[in-house]
Amino acid sequence: MSAVADLDQRISGIAKHDYWQDVFERYGGRRKGRFFLMAEDGNKKLLGYIMGEVRAWEFDSPPCGWVFGINVDSDGRLGGIGTALFQAICDGFRKVGVHTVRTTVSRKNELVMSFFRSQGMMASHYIQLETELDP
């Protein structure tokens, strides 16, 4: 877990130990429809990870795969690691019977937006809405 949390902190600039502890508790084991995949080099150094799950019937959407986290070490980008991770999670989604993959990306995150577009993802007919809550 520490290698994933460290990679995330190097890229995001934010330490999220409690978040990663929760993620590993929920997604670290093998459960149908939940995926936490990692890529390592020959020395067991973490190169990247991707995580997602099958979600069903959110606002009448049939079951689909959701990717909600991906990171690749900056030294390993453009080496196909992200593509390999994305293809692996898509293969996992196919094996459990879903045929659509979705994600949410910040408009400001051009790197991740470009990556997902390079994988064939595009805007869908669903729109994300949000509001700020008063304290």
What are these regions (language model features)?
Residues 77, 103-112, 130, 134:
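Conserved beta-strand-loop-alpha-helix junction that forms the acyl-donor binding cleft
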Residues 40, 67-77, 105:
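A short, internal acetyl-CoA/4′-phosphopantetheine-binding micro-motif in the GNAT/acyltransferase core
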Residues 1-4:
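A short beta-loop-alpha structural element at the N-terminal edge
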Residues 6, 10-62, 68, 132:
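Acetyl-CoA-dependent GNAT
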Residues 117-127:
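Conserved acetyl-CoA-binding loop of GNAT-fold acetyltransferases
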Residues 72, 78-91, 114-118:
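Conserved acetyl-CoA-binding loop-helix of GNAT-fold acetyltransferases
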Residues 86, 93-105:
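Conserved GNAT acetyl-CoA-binding A-motif
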